[in-house]
Structures are given as structure tokens and as C-alpha cells.
Amino acid sequence: ITTVLYSQLHALDLTRYNYFISFRSLYVKDHPERMERLPDGVGIYPLASEMNMDLLTIAAQLLKLKGHAGSWSECRLHTAYRREWKKHFGSTEFACVIHYNGYEAYTTALLEEAPCPRSIWVHNDMAKEVHLKGNMNAHLLKEAYHTYDHIVPVSEDLIQPVVSEFGADRSRITVIHNCHDFQSVLE
């Protein structure tokens, strides 16, 4: 996914909008050279701290991940993630946010609370990923696919699992194929 992200960033007109990449700092700590591949003009918002949760919020999170969340726990989690949004981004106004890799529970829940249009990309059959690899939570994905404004699979064959397994609204799905930076391959 990282290679495709770099390719898509290089294909964008970076003078038309301000683009920012946000990532958890610990993911690039061991490979800082990854940041050198970002095109000039792309800003960064590193997320340097972990989420602070009290015991009730931890309990609400565990209930949600098991599919047993009720209104009190949902309210508590949304409040906690809105607080996280403010902690990381302050009063910065974004025209939209894109959860590009579509994985990781924290980022999925954090961007769900963004006060602007939200898009989540789908690079793989997430139903298979959940069942075979266990690398994402089905309950969290279902909520994300119901609340994000746009769901963006990278191929047509990924639409059906998103709709049938997670109940996503077909009208919010737009396929955008991966972009490959052929220039850097030729170089």
C-alpha cells in the first residue's frame, strides 16, 4: 500500500490543494527514509502519542470490538476519539480526510470523528482479511463503512464484499484504481 500511496501522491497536482500525510510516529521511527520519498509540497502531521483511556473507555472499546457496544459505550468512545482528534490536529480545518490504507483500528476510529467529509479506501477483500488473518476488526469495519462518507475500493471485485459482508451503502462506493508511478520505475 505504501508504494501505491507514493505513486498516487506523485500523480496529484500538488499546487491545487494542500496535502498532508498523517501517520503514527512509531511506524517510521525504524525507517525514516520513507519520509524522503514524499513529494515536495506534501505536509506531515505525525501522531506522536498514544491514546489515553480511562477504565470505562477501555471497557467500552473492548465491548465495541466484540460487537456488544451499547449507546453509553458508543457515546463514550466517540467523545474519546473526538478528544484525540483535537489533541492531534487542534483547530486545523481540512476539506476532507482520507484513511488511505483502510487498516488499523485506531486510525479508523480517529478519522471517523473528523469534522469534514471522510473517505476510507479498500485495498483488499476485508471480509477475507478479518476471517483469515484477523488483522482488522469486523465490527469496527462495519461501523466505518456505515459512517464514512465515501468508500473507495481499488477494484470492482472489492465492492461485493464491502456491501454483502459489512452492509455498506452502494451509493457511497466509488472505485478508484491504483495509480502506478511508471516514471520512477523507468528511472
Regions found by a protein language model. Name each.
Residues 1-6, 27-29:
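A short, glycine/small-residue-rich beta-strand->loop->alpha-helix junction that serves as a flexible
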Residues 11, 16-70, 158:
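N-terminal strand-loop element at the rim of the active site
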Residues 56-73, 120-138:
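Acceptor-binding helix/loop patch of EC 2.4 sugar-transfer enzymes
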Residues 81, 99-105, 122:
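Short His-centered aromatic/hydrophobic patch
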Residues 83-92, 134-153:
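Membrane-proximal helix-turn-helix segments that form the acceptor-binding/catalytic region
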Residues 157, 176-179:
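Carbohydrate-associated surface elements
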Residues 185-187:
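A short helix/loop element that forms part of the nucleotide-sugar donor recognition site in Leloir-type
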